[in-house]
């Protein structure tokens, strides 16, 4: 993949992309908690921090998380040692009024998370191809939360193990 940048931007942004070849190598708790902590420092309206994470890094939770993925994503994401479901609280904690910025703020948190991961040599790939209704039921997510994405997190793997259409 060749990308041409017209301006001088942060190297982390230049280097970041969403590969599909994952190694099964475990991610250390220190690295995992650091990338989650980076997300916690994302800017948000009234510092609400509406994002919520459901972390799957053990086999039982990974199996559950994989079961919500559509087959196209499951083909490659099944090797990722961590899957992270991201949801956004739709109302403010203070007054239960609608937070019109919940998705914008949650996207900012995802961006911070992905850049911290990149800095640590960890790859991330956000997916839209999963069953939101199944996720809501399996993980008991209330209607006050909007399910945003599932993110594969891990180390870069062997691209030759992917089918040609996924390379």
Predicted regions span which residues?
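Acidic, surface-exposed loops and disordered segments
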Residues: 1-167
């Amino acid at each position: 993949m060749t990308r041409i940048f017209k301006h001088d931007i942060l190297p982390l942004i230049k280097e970041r992309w969403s590969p599909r070849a994952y190694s099964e190598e475990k991610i250390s708790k220190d690295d995992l908690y650091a990338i989650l902590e980076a997300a916690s420092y994302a800017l948000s309206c009234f510092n609400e921090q509406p994002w919520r994470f459901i972390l799957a890094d053990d086999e039982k939770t990974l199996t559950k998380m994989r079961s919500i993925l559509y087959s196209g994503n499951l083909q490659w994401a099944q090797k990722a040692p961590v899957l992270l479901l991201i949801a956004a609280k739709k109302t403010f904690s203070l007054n239960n009024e609608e937070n019109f910025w919940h998705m914008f703020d949650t996207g900012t948190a995802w961006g911070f998370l992905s850049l911290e991961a990149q800095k640590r040599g960890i790859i991330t790939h956000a997916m839209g191809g999963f069953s939101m209704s199944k996720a809501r039921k399996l993980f008991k997510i209330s209607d006050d939360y909007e399910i945003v994405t599932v993110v594969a997190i891990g180390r870069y793997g062997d691209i030759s193990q992917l089918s040609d259409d996924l390379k």
